[in-house]
């Protein structure tokens, strides 16, 4: 029986591969079902012989308790976006300046959810969401319910791959029809449906919804030399790989490919929102390297957003956490990119003036980045004596006079006691990317503020069960959960706290870069502007904003109150040594190294505090030149940049 179970498992897995990966079914559905039922019967009788990669392990359901955080061994970066041919040409120019013979691989940008799959000796161990690129969620049990993801590879490799999970248009339509019949809320679009499915706690639901995948990258080290070779290897290993891609050195041919794909976009069985262009050589990719946010060797061309006409009925003005007052248009409802849109941003007062937008105008509405509804411009041919929009002079929340600084495009409320400003600041502090206080959303924050329980973020840590119980709709169990979430947030790493403070220009990635150097929030109270500006990826604007914030007496008081409440001030990641020999220097490696390989040299430079980049520019501080160094060495000499050799590096 053990032998027969093995035969059936291998046979069914091959049929599944033919169907899902090669798109060439090699057996009828009835024959497949017959073999499948035989395997199920045998496995029930001999459970000790069930194999890890059995197709029966991908059906049925398990109720999960939740999803654990998962730290990616290899960070998953986002891509730089491009919206025009000019931006693609600029990318091409940057790459060709370093590598004149570079070729590109253009691939479809699938509109789904980015996933990471890790295998050990050929067996699937972990499936995770991208998250913020460093930390995602472990969704392995749900990943196993996606039929075209192999549980066992065709070779016993230890490998981590990246791809996109998506829902086909056909599956999306069928699911929404079922939800409509059952009186359930329909999904807005296939991407939202896929996202909701991957976060299901009932794995049977995941199996039923028939997600699919396309894999496109080996994020762990690979023996392949070219990206097109990586795609071929992924297909050989049993993954689904998108068949549409083009290899070329010509941006003209890339543009023709983009236009061809855009024209047939609606004929595909799944949603795409653009084309990704990658340098095909993996060695060139390594030399080009990364910015803080994205690889320098790839760019994502986004298709133009869908546009619709709508009428502006009224405008709401709201105050954000930094005091910026943002206008939002209320519109006649329109269907846009799979959702009903009745509100759209007008950005700021300068934008309204530039476009001459008025109440009652018919306007063109689109989704910026296919996400945020925005007003593009006015359909002037349909204007009929609409009145010029009145720009508020007073804050809609506190009544203070609004200011319009010369160097800004927005109106701003500068009253630190403005109720909306305080509430938005509290909401931001509790948000997922900041302190991640589960349950403490806008509605609860508003109730706490109006009840007088919170006036700044430190007050959150003084809240009691009795405080919550006084709020409408809060029962004892909810109060206990909120207090537990608040207590749990105290142990967050300090970069989440720094981001949560809502300092202008200090985002989540910048917060991490700052704490990698300073290590502790308290150290920022005495940090110097010029020191902060030296940190790789930052600059004078960020440095000025940070020092101005922490120079305020109120900042020192707030930090002290948070510390007294038990909130962690320390960065839990690996700290950068600001006293290191090469701290803050931008270094380029070029030529052949004899004693160190390139990764070893890069690791040593980064350990010494340097930022390693792939191109020489005026911003380069140092070039490490090996033998046969070419154009980069010559450029460094012409710019008067310091040049050292491998022996010098080894002696540091």
From Swiss-Prot:
Keywords: DNA damage, DNA repair, DNA replication, Ligase, Magnesium, Manganese, Metal-binding, NAD, Zinc. The keyword Metal-binding applies. Its EC number is 6.5.1.2. Its cofactor is Mg(2+); Mn(2+). GO terms for biological process: DNA repair; DNA replication. NAD(+) binds at residues 29-33, 78-79, 107, 130, 164, 278, 302. One of its GO terms (cellular component) is cytosol. The keyword NAD applies. Zn(2+) binds at residues 395, 398, 413, 418. It catalyses: NAD(+) + (deoxyribonucleotide)n-3'-hydroxyl + 5'-phospho-(deoxyribonucleotide)m = (deoxyribonucleotide)n+m + AMP + beta-nicotinamide D-nucleotide. This is DNA ligase. The lineage of its organism: Bacteria, Bacillati, Bacillota, Bacilli, Lactobacillales.
